[in-house]
Amino acid sequence: MAQFQQTIDMQTLQAAAGRNSLVNDLASRRVYDNAVEELNARSRRPKVHFSKAVSTEQTLIATNAYPEFEISFTHTQSAVHSLAGGLRSLELEYLMMQVPFGSLTYDIGGNFSAHLFKGRDYVHCCMPNLDVRDIARHEGHKEAIYSYVNRLKRQQRPVPEYQRAAFNNYAENPHFVHCDKPFQQCELTTAYGTDTYAVALHSIYDIPVEEFGSALLRKNVKTCFAAFHFHENMLLDCDTVTLDEIGATFQKSGDNLSFFFHNESTLNYTHSFSNIIKYVCKTFFPASQRFVYHKEFLVTRVNTWYCKFTRVDTFTLFRGVYHNNVDCEEFYKAMDDAWHYKKTLAMLNAERTIFKDNAALNFWFPKVRDMVIVPLFDASITTGRMSRREIMVNKDFVYTVLNHIKTYQAKALTYANVLSFVESIRSRVIINGVTARSEWDTDKAILGPLAMTFFLITKLGHVQDEIILKKFQKFDRTTNELIWTSLCDALMGVIPSVKETLVRGGFVKVAEQALEIKVPELYCTFADRLVLQYKKAEEFQSCDLSKPLEESEKYYNALSELSVLENLDSFDLEAFKTLCQQKNVDPDMAAKVVVAIMKSELTLPFKKPTEEEISESLKPGEGSCAEHKEVLSLQNDAPFPCVKNLVEGSVPAYGMCPKGGGFDKLDVDIADFHLKSVDAVKKGTMMSAVYTGSIKVQQMKNYIDYLSASLAATVSNLCKVLRDVHGVDPESQEKSGVWDVRRGRWLLKPNAKSHAWGVAEDANHKLVIVLLNWDDGKPVCDETWFRVAVSSDSLIYSDMGKLKTLTSCSPNGEPPEPNAKVILVDGVPGCGKTKEIIEKVNFSEDLILVPGKEASKMIIRRANQAGVIRADKDNVRTVDSFLMHPSRRVFKRLFIDEGLMLHTGCVNFLLLLSQCDVAYVYGDTKQIPFICRVANFPYPAHFAKLVADEKEVRRVTLRCPADVTYFLNKKYDGAVMCTSAVERSVKAEVVRGKGALNPITLPLEGKILTFTQADKFELLEKGYKDVNTVHEVQGETYEKTAIVRLTSTPLEIISSASPHVLVALTRHTTCCKYYTVVLDPMVNVISEMEKLSNFLLDMYRVEAGVQYQLQIDAVFRDSNLFVQTPKSGDWRDMQFYYDALLPGNSTILNEFDAVTMNLRDISLNVKDCRIDFSKSVQLPKEQPIFLKPKIRTAAEMPRTAGLLENLVAMIKRNMNAPDLTGTIDIEDTASLVVEKFWDSYVDKEFSGTNEMTMTRESFSRWLSKQESSTVGQLADFNFVDLPAVDEYKHMIKSQPKQKLDLSIQDEYPALQTIVYHSKKINAIFGPMFSELTRMLLERIDSSKFLFYTRKTPAQIEDFFSDLDSTQAMEILELDISKYDKSQNEFHCAVEYKIWEKLGIDEWLAEVWKQGHRKTTLKDYTAGVKTCLWYQRKSGDVTTFIGNTIIIAACLSSMIPMDKVIKAAFCGDDSLIYIPKGLDLPDIQAGANLMWNFEAKLFRKKYGYFCGRYVIHHDRGAIVYYDPLKLISKLGCKHIRDVVHLEELRESLCDVASNLNNCAYFSQLDEAVAEVHKTAVGGSFAFCSIIKYLSDKRLFRDLFFV
């Protein structure tokens, strides 16, 4: 023990000496934590903007004086007395901090504009015009308001939300905001008994003290906070007092006290000195016989004194403090009234029960320390009179001078010598023989009178010294003494000493007193007395805490309820409390719902279980659930009348179904759908507004709702087709079709026949669902029908039949919970699941269910291959067949193959309908799960998990080779083994563009697989056979597979963790080859498998012996600072930079690619079109000569329009449109998307719908933007009839667009196309959509969202300049390929609904809509004519704004825009800044299924928008034009001559102006490296760009002939 104690003592000593590193680290960590806490606390302080230009010392004064605020010094405004003026805002904010927020407050003499800017709608300013200066000051306040409003109007920004209530109050009731009466006469009234507050900032000087208390009481002011300038020296009877910190002066003349700022010419303010002294020295301010306002000082800051006046009820004084005493005033009054009575009677009348209080106020004068009061004398030449005054001078200075000049001889003691010495010692002193600056800073103006006083005092001192010496040397009397002696003897001692008495009484002034030097007192005490007469006693009122205590009890109970949650730490209790208060929700009820949701006992179908969503769901609403008929709403935040209408404190045991929900009876036959109104199917089909019950029951309800939503979406789309089709189009082959019953022909021809059902329009234009029969390829229709619509989704009764069955077995909307035991068999790919099912099943009593027909036929064939018929269509069925026509048999066991690809509710219904005892669900947890195909339908994560009683695993694959088994081991728990003898089976090949893939030059061996439907259709059009997507072949086995990727844009489903990659690599048994146009994660996976050694591959075979585990570790920052970019470098620096970022592009010899394409044979996959081959031969033209660039890039020569060029461009830009969309109810979903768009982007003030009015001015605005040639084409247009709106002209741009990637090395880039209307159509619709665009942009919240239309680069930079770099945020970019041609009927519906909300004319809107539905393209140059459905036309009047609207609507439907910091949209470009950690949905899946976009979401550190890098930093943001794009333009090959070259230079100078600022080149390098992985530091190249752009001669050297 002794040794142990000794060790402890040694360690303690080492820690104390700082030699213990662990203790030092702990101490450093503690200091760091304390610093972080302090900085966080400081950042939460109120922020004050200090715009006045002040010095560094004054900045420290303001910061140290007001630590409560975080002061931002911008130094943007130079003004008189800038420090005092800037402190005014701090003083006002400090006073308002003392007032409870929202309480009615009187600002005595206040500035109402300051309160408006702060959004305080509860402040009334009493602003009397006591002189002309007050009127001018108040006009300045109004000017500030006008300037602010005009600035907002100029910037097209609305009044901010926090200011809106105050500005509305000022606009509607200005008399509440301010009045022109003094505070004592203010006429604003409040509710009786309501306490108010008051603040007085430098305004109580002008209120008489006698009126102040009564004025406060008249307004029922509880507390008044005041601030005023003062200085203690004013109590010393000084005529002038200087306030050094703010540079001001008080000057007293009689009772007038003047205040002014020195060192500048400003106004002078005059007040009553006696009135101010009373405010300073008094403590009690009587208001009535009952109430008194008690004053106490709070703090003194920068020459400003703060005090507080508190209303005191004297009736609450303790009775014992009163005493019977004589009130002096009453005594004198009684004596006057009754002088003839006795004194005793007068005393009795004056006796009262009174209370006396005495308050003493001490003032400390710190500047009088070491000071003395010295008299000064002035004489008048005219009158001969002498005046005397006093000043304070440094004590040490005075006695140093007096002691020195007392040493002068009588001849040397002259006034001139004294003045000379005083002047010299004031300016310098000699210390150790060295001259130094004097420490006494005495005013030079008083040195003359002060020297005279010193001279007189010294003279008097010499006389006194002589008298003393004579007293000691001679004992005789002087003549003066003899006179006094004679006078005293004559008076004979009546007064002991007449001389002393006369002097003491002031009748006689002696020299000693006139020249006396006095020492001032450091403290001065002022007493204030209060006398109260006893009138009444009342009890002191206590604070009412019952309400907050009751609320605390509720939240305590709610916390107790929430304590059962496992992850309570991650639950934001503070947010829960705040939202319950905002939504007016009972916390206990909300807590019960939270627990139920977290335990999966309750589910809000269309909401996430967050604090905000739960509070919103529980918010009290009007009416009951039965009143809400339209419950199904396809959006993520659809409002549900759910738990908020339940009985308080209880959770229901069953789901609530609104009126009209479900079907009228349980046993519904499919025939009941015939002639059923479409509204009955589209509305009210939700099983439950709130999912309750066990998790299995909730999954089953969700599955029924999923079928209902799918059917409703299909019916809605058929209704839309009926409304949209007007003309005849017998040549079309689309998914939808419309049959004209009366004419007996197809108005819109479908690509399939024999549909099971459709939607019919009868003679009354009523839409009903009809079941169809067919005769010779034509539907058999009732004669009362007008038209019938069908689609590919109505080919079979699938959804109807399943709904019939499932609703029949769900009485009262509550499906019974299945009791079967569920065994989940989780097997790796190829583990023999199907083989195991066939071996284990007893076909006489068991049932096998599979997803598709081919799988059921395969199982029947394999089970019966021995010759004995065991399997048939009764015991081996598809899931859809069984759900539509369930068997009446009772099965003992159920086997479901690929059960994890099914909706979990579907699996539970299969268990229920089969009535089995045990169910074996075979699947793979790592492969592709069930994918919800109905856009925006909720399928929560806890619903996707199958509830199983047992789980078995199969980890031996019979299909996969050894190299794939290695890949599987990284995906599954436990060791995965294989039985295959094949060791190496996978290869990857990067092809040089999708054009390299065709059946002739590159035949693909085995089953062809793709990841997307677009790639699948493109391969089929190229001529390949037997092509499927990976999702379609899950569960299948092939000997050889060929996986193809044609999409060059990033795909989220192709990643190392994607289940699609797992399925794709596990379909083969011997060989798999991956063909891709880009390097992607799957290439890396295959490359890793190819590098494996045979030793490692042997480990994964079942026959392998001892297994060896090898482990291999992987080896492997509001205004911009400006620094001028040096103009240095050479053009070769730009070449090097280009080659580093795009290696290989500069070596491409593409000058004759166009010639080669026209001369050689070519194979094109062309959609239906008409071609005039007479245009295939181009007329010979003289080729122009272009300048050649020194910088080698991938730029191409201009091309000549012709049949092949135009046709290739048309195929690339307009044909082969992707079709990725799932099942969407176009009309309803479009309405929801538009509402979300409106809520997200449009300012609430302009959220209503207006009627658009076309005026002459709007047409003139459009006409002024048109070229003269365009106006000339309209000269012969009579505007009587419309040209064909559905006919477009087609042309190409001659210059190919340069891509900043490596695709030029493998592809022949197609030209950009222009699809445009005639000028006559543009003249009609152009002004209309220009006006609609203007109306829309006016409504956009421009402070948060940027719609990049007619904006300059400087405006982009200004928009992003207020980004806070200290805030943790993420930057999102949505990259969409094939943007224009991906837009289909849904996109058009969204755009039209937005125009409708802006008030577009209905007739013109319908014409425009029909003109964009089915359109005809004619290319007269190439002789090509084709037909397109929908798509965005590149030369339309709505092309740019329409594309911008669509990308904004797309993102608002998937991203919570209310949480977005900044967002910008331009065409297909988008840039979004969101807080870091925000929970986002699957953007890529939403873009595919709902918006038909091939999209990829990038998360970056810096934004990239419209070819510019947005670099945000701690001072704002700077926008750099893409330097790589700039260098690419310097390598262009279409420059005609020197004039054209100079035009190019000027345009590049405009866009690249910010490259002149090199302060943020390091951040620019980081941003470029995010896009181009091979990027190097580019400062040298940027300097070279600026050098050549800024010099005409050097720029010309970049090109040669």
From Swiss-Prot:
GO terms for biological process: DNA-templated transcription; mRNA modification; RNA processing; symbiont-mediated suppression of host innate immune response; viral RNA genome replication. Residues 72-280 form the Alphavirus-like MT domain. The keyword Protein biosynthesis does not apply. Residues 50-436 are annotated as: Methyltransferase. Residues 823-1076 are annotated as: Helicase. Keywords: ATP-binding, Helicase, Host-virus interaction, Hydrolase, Inhibition of host innate immune response by virus, Nucleotide-binding, Nucleotidyltransferase, RNA suppression of termination, RNA-directed RNA polymerase, Suppressor of RNA silencing, Transferase, Viral immunoevasion, Viral RNA replication. Its EC number is 2.1.1.-, 2.7.7.-, 2.7.7.48, 3.6.4.13. Residues 1369-1482 form the RdRp catalytic domain. Gene3D superfamilies: 3.30.450.420, P-loop containing nucleotide triphosphate hydrolases. CDD domains: Virgaviridae_RdRp. It catalyses: RNA(n) + a ribonucleoside 5'-triphosphate = RNA(n+1) + diphosphate; ATP + H2O = ADP + phosphate + H(+). It comes from the Viruses. Heterodimer of a large and a small subunit. This protein is translated as a fusion protein by episodic readthrough of a termination codon which is expressed as tyrosine. When readthrough of the terminator codon TGA occurs between the codons for Phe-1116 and Asp-1118, this results in the addition of the RdRp region to the replicase. This is Replicase large subunit.
